[in-house]
Amino acid sequence: MESAIAKTGPITALGAMSGTSLDGVDAAIVVTDGVAIDGFGASAYEPYSDAQRAVLAKALGQWQGADVEAATGVIEQVHRTVLARFQQARLIGFHGQTLAHAPHTQGTLQVGDGAWLATALDRPVIWDFRTRDVEMGGEGAPLAPFFHFACAKYIGATQPLAFLNLGGVGNLTYVDPSFARPEEVGALLAFDTGPANAPVNDLVQARLGLAYDRDGQVAREGTVCQRVLERALTAPYFARIPPKSLDRNDFSQIVDLVDTLPDADAVATLTALSAAAVSQGVRHCPQVPQQVLVTGGGRKNPVLMEMLQSMLACPVKPVEDVGLDGDMLEAQAFAYLGVRVARGLPTSCPGTTGVRAPVGGGRISYPGTAAMAAQTG
């Protein structure tokens, strides 16, 4: 396949994401010039087996060693399997799997070799999106906000709104679509709100042998312990001014707070914490968004959605209500960001990660060649 990336016009790009929930790999096509979204294409999901998930979970929080190498192998092989289905893609935006994230001390680690994938798939691969942002003083996360800005334009939004991703960690993006470009001051504010699905998933796995609380069934049977909830909300992270970001394990001790609660009460309390973290986060926005559009697995939990609506002073709805795909939005984001990197456009800015100036990170690997830095800013 011809490996050159067109310098102008829309590109059929493929994005891939493996999130902190460790459920599997999402892959999706976006047609874009790196500024506007022309349209969306096919998508696919490849779940991890129980054995693969165990390998990944064992490596969480580690920076090197045998466990990290084993996790890298899982990520590369599963991505190769799912991405090979998309022969129409001209380039691939590959996020990899975050194992550790400590931007102000050790940096950030996403495993998976984009250069290896480029050769294996015979496509240019854009990868290592976060390192440059961290090197320039940013949090390295979240990175989806520039795509959220494009989505707001795509759906014709004219008033400020927010995108809320409820994965293992919650991420909020405030978008003012009156601005022309996402890097303009005031166009975006983005940050991690706090724990979302990860503590609940970990708890129901440990106590009940469940992968997650399907449809909020366990939480529905429980009662929120206000004492524990209020104590959890005293964590210093919630008072920090954004931009700010989290590692999946930063709130692992939260599960300890519900140790003495019955199963259903513990799950209900952790679910309420996810919603309360978002409610506190929205207070940091320049103004109350006209609507909050929810993506990620958390939007499928009716108890969590009800809690969010009760705590927020604006409509809360799944992104499907405006014609977007809540299962694939993060994968689509990395397709979009891949094109921006290839075109030399920024992928983060002070309002999204706290980086000193708008910057475009990432490396580009072509089939059979080494990776090249592709940076702006």
From Swiss-Prot:
It comes from the Bacteria. This is Anhydro-N-acetylmuramic acid kinase. It comes from Roseobacter denitrificans (strain ATCC 33942 / OCh 114). GO terms for molecular function: ATP binding; kinase activity; phosphotransferase activity, alcohol group as acceptor. SUPFAM superfamilies: Actin-like ATPase domain. It catalyses: 1,6-anhydro-N-acetyl-beta-muramate + ATP + H2O = N-acetyl-D-muramate 6-phosphate + ADP + H(+). Belongs to the anhydro-N-acetylmuramic acid kinase family. Its EC number is 2.7.1.170. Keywords: ATP-binding, Carbohydrate metabolism, Kinase, Nucleotide-binding, Transferase. Catalyzes the specific phosphorylation of 1,6-anhydro-N-acetylmuramic acid (anhMurNAc) with the simultaneous cleavage of the 1,6-anhydro ring, generating MurNAc-6-P. Is required for the utilization of anhMurNAc either imported from the medium or derived from its own cell wall murein, and thus plays a role in cell wall recycling. The keyword ATP-binding applies. ATP binds at G19, T20, S21, L22, D23, G24, V25, D26. Pathway: Amino-sugar metabolism; 1,6-anhydro-N-acetylmuramate degradation; Cell wall biogenesis; peptidoglycan recycling. InterPro entries: Anhydro_N_Ac-Mur_kinase, ATPase_NBD. PANTHER family: ANHYDRO-N-ACETYLMURAMIC ACID KINASE. Pfam families: AnmK. One of its GO terms (biological process) is peptidoglycan turnover.
